[in-house]
């Protein structure tokens, strides 16, 4: 796996492109399941073109202790996805304390993309308004 990813990174790196590896929680049979495993693979590839996609929803399901695990793998994280657990909806609809996570990302100086990979907990306009309210709430840590 590492050798194949190195070959891919060799193609991407001269162009400043980055591939991201995403550990998932949908099945225990999946190859990538933890942030530590993905971190070690990225370290083995040893290229700025091979990084971690840290999906907060999947990592909460697989390992919890989100801030600690983000810190352990920080230097390899290139992209972060958002989704609450359970339900994979907007922040504030599940158990994840997104206000603390957003505060931590801010304090770490994270300037990357935060992908909203989740559904809405309510349908239609009501759901869109709930989504906006949720993001305002979790972004209000200052």
Question: Could you describe each region identified by the protein language model?
Answer:
Residues 1-15:
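An active-site-proximal structural segment forming one wall of the substrate-binding cleft
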Residues 6, 32-54, 58-142:
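Histidine-acidic metal/acid-base catalytic patches
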Residues 12-45:
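Basic- and aromatic-lined ligand-binding clefts that recognize polyanionic substrates
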């Amino acid at each position: 796996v590492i050798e194949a990813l190195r070959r891919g990174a060799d193609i991407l790196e001269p162009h400043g492109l980055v591939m991201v590896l995403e550990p998932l929680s949908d099945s225990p049979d999946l190859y990538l399941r933890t942030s530590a495993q993905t971190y070690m693979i990225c370290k083995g590839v040893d290229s700025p073109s091979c990084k971690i996609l840290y999906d907060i929803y999947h990592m909460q399901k697989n390992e919890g202790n989100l801030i600690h695990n983000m810190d352990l793998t920080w230097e390899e994280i290139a992209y972060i996805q958002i989704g609450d657990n359970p339900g994979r909806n907007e922040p504030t609809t599940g158990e994840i304390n997104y206000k603390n996570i957003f505060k931590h990302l801010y304090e770490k100086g994270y300037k990357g993309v935060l992908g909203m990979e989740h559904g809405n907990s309510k349908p239609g306009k009501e759901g869109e308004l709930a989504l906006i309210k949720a993001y305002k709430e979790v972004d209000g840590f200052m």
